[in-house]
């Protein structure tokens, strides 16, 4: 009797030797849940780059789900979990009610998107600061929500084999599951190969320097002191809200280090690695976010700045009617741009460029704060890799929030000079971080044209010793996610897809909220209709998209209805009956107007497919907070028909008898929440509840967590891979100014 559960636990199926294989297969299919049969994947695949160890059998059944797949938690949301959510809702809701009049304060300096961290000491307004009616409504809402949630065990969306593989791959000493560059699918790699390639390709280069643990701790402590000095020195240059955010963030830091990891470029032959430094939560992350907000408006003024492929498509459509007979397309790519940038030269170029700006927008004290923040962030990038500590000595500090803006600004300043020198040959020039796209105007003399094209490439390669790779001049190029074609009087575009893209969309049975599935489909359809010029190609890509979603377990009826809804929505927004319009308005549909007086209350909740749906929570909000209807008990006495009788009594023939009262319930409609006022006399503008789900950990969180190369105690450490003791032959750096 013990053999059957053991076989099911190990192999996921029990085969009775006394029965035929077809009967065993039939019984196995009957035992499967309907979810696994209706949403079975047709393309479970991944990139296997293992050369040392042999992966376990059926590993593609797990990794083929994609790293965005969320396994269903074994239990529904417990009472303890919902209590924390209810407590947060009470605090957030009462805080919104308390401060709802501040948005009309003329002295309020708050702006949308402003950096903000709530004080750790804030636990909501005091009890007497909120009207009693609001407390009553919130308590009624919480009392209704609380009984809806109770912990119970549920069936997971993984087979026994997949659960065993998930347990095996978590902190495995032999294998690592690594995301691929360009989102081409998960990569299974030998752990030692991954660590060795990270060291050989990046960390052992002169750009980086290894530190001892003592030196790294001293370095991060000194960085904290420098950041505090920065805040004191530039207190008058930074707004009060941003200063408050920076102080609160610095006080909340628990781990001062950033962490290094690499993505696998499987589309390269042989495969390569892309270095990434995750700085979220580190000492300088808050300052980096502030600096990026200062640089973003500046880079948007550069003539060669390109924010996205949608903007590129819009600008190319505006060129319709131009004679392109003497023009060609080209692209350029900088190899390892971030480490190649010479920091001191970049500081000089950017500081010189700041002197040309309007002082009313960028006053000198703000410019000094920006340059000081750049100096601090770009020269203090200290991070961990496994049990080792490293310092980036040169180049752009990878992973920091202002890194893309810094690199874009630095090269955009140089491109201003490039446009002056080669403007007669450049009909169009744009760049997106390290990628460049342009339209070249040919000279009538072929020899002159060839020399000018060569000078253009050499001029860029000589700037900052960047290693450029240019395409040849042609009528068709690949740039970002587009294939751009040069036609006689227009430029058409289509989608470009990497050949090794596995198209692992979120499977149907993933533990995501239902609206996520629809949003993935809708955004994919909108992307096809916005970026593709010709209608025949739109239909071809829509058909491919439909087929790929079927392979991920989606059913036909759901896809048909969602596709039709998305197409109708797109046609409505673009005021077109068919998705063939190529006018610029097609690519920037206007959103429906929002009522500026309406606000939402947010209910943060962990998502579980077996929990009560969001519509029940929103219904409870409407019934108990927004527009409650209460039932009040009232005593009603009998009334006789005798005109001489008095109310509440009747004559039984001998004497007058008082009638017993009858208890009834009467509906009492209370005023809407928007009709109530807080204690400052301001109307409360909250009219709806948004259930903000946060998903369960996905496969990427489980198989490739932060600092994954150092979390397996039985694996070979990074310092051992270096063939060095952990702190030997590492540099002891007391300080870096």
In which residue ranges do the predicted regions lie?
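Charged structural interfaces that engage phosphate-rich ligands
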Residues: 1-737
């Amino acid at each position: 009797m013990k053999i059957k559960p053991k076989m099911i636990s190990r192999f996921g199926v029990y085969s009775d030797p006394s029965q035929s294989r077809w009967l065993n297969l039939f019984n196995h299919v009957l035992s499967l849940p309907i979810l696994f049969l209706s949403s079975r994947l047709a393309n479970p695949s991944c990139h296997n780059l293992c050369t040392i160890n042999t992966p376990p059998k059926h590993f593609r059944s797990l990794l083929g789900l994609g790293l965005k797949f969320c396994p269903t938690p074994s239990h529904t949301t417990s009472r303890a979990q919902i209590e924390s959510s209810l407590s947060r809702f009470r605090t957030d809701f009462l805080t919104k009610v308390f401060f709802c009049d501040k948005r009309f304060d003329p002295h309020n300096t708050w702006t949308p998107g402003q950096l903000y961290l709530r004080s750790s000491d804030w636990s909501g307004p005091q009890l007497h600061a909120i009207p009693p009616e609001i407390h009553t409504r919130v308590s009624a809402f919480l009392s209704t929500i609380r009984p809806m949630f109770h912990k119970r065990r549920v069936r997971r969306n993984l087979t026994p084999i997949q659960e065993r593989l998930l347990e095996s791959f978590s902190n495995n000493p032999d294998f690592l599951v690594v995301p691929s560059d360009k989102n081409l699918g998960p990569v299974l790699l030998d752990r030692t190969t991954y660590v060795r390639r990270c060291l050989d390709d990046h960390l052992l280069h002169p750009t980086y320097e290894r530190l001892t643990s003592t030196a790294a701790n001293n370095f991060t402590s000194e960085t904290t002191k420098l950041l505090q000095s920065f805040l004191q020195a530039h207190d008058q240059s930074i707004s009060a809200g941003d200063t408050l955010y920076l102080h609160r963030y610095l006080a909340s830091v628990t781990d001062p280090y950033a962490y290094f990891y690499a993505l696998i470029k499987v589309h390269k032959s042989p495969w390569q690695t892309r270095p990434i430094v995750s700085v979220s939560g580190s000492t300088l992350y808050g300052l980096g976010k502030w600096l990026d907000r200062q640089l973003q408006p500046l880079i948007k003024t550069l003539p060669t700045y390109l924010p996205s492929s949608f903007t590129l498509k819009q600008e190319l459509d505006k060129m319709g009617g131009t004679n392109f007979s003497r023009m060609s397309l080209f692209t350029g790519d900088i190899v390892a741009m971030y480490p190649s940038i010479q920091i001191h030269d970049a500081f000089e170029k950017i500081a010189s460029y700041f002197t040309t700006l309007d002082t009313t927008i960028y006053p000198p004290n703000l410019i000094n704060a920006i340059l000081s923040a750049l100096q601090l962030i770009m020269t203090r990038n200290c991070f961990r890799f496994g049990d080792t500590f490293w310092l980036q000595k040169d180049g752009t500090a990878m992973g920091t929030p202002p890194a893309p803006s810094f690199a874009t600004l630095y090269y955009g300043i140089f491109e201003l000079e490039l446009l002056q020198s080669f403007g007669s040959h450049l009909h169009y020039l744009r760049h997106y971080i390290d990628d460049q796209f342009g339209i070249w105007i040919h000279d009538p003399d072929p020899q002159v044209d060839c020399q000018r094209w060569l000078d253009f490439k050499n001029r860029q390669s000589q700037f900052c010793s960047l290693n450029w790779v240019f395409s040849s001049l042609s009528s068709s190029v690949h740039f970002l996610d587009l294939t751009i074609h040069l036609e006689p009087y227009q430029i058409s575009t289509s989608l470009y897809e990497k050949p090794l893209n596995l198209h692992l969309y979120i499977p149907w049975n993933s533990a995501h909220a239902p609206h996520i599935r629809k949003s993935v489909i809708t955004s994919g359809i909108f992307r096809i209709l916005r970026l593709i010029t010709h209608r025949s190609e739109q239909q071809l890509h829509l058909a491919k998209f439909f087929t790929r979603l079927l392979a991920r377990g989606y059913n036909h009826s759901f896809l048909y209805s969602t596709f039709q809804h998305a197409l109708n929505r797109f046609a409505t927004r673009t005021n077109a009956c068919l998705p063939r319009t190529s006018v610029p308005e097609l690519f920037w549909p206007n959103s429906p107007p929002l009522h500026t007086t309406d606000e939402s209350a947010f209910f943060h909740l962990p998502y579980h497919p077996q929990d009560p749906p969001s519509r029940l929570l929103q219904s409870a909000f409407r019934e108990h907070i927004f527009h409650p209807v209460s039932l009040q008990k009232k005593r009603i006495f009998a009334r006789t028909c005798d005109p001489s009788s008095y109310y509440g009594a009747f004559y039984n023939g001998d004497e007058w008898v008082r009638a017993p009262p009858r208890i009834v319930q009467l509906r009492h409609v209370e005023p809407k929440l928007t009709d109530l006022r807080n204690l400052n006399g301001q109307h409360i503008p909250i009219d709806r509840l948004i259930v903000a789900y946060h998903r369960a950990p996905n496969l990427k969180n489980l198989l490739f967590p932060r600092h994954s190369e150092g979390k397996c105690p039985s694996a070979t450490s990074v310092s051992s891979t270096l063939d060095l003791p952990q702190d030997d032959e590492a540099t002891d750096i007391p300080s870096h100014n």
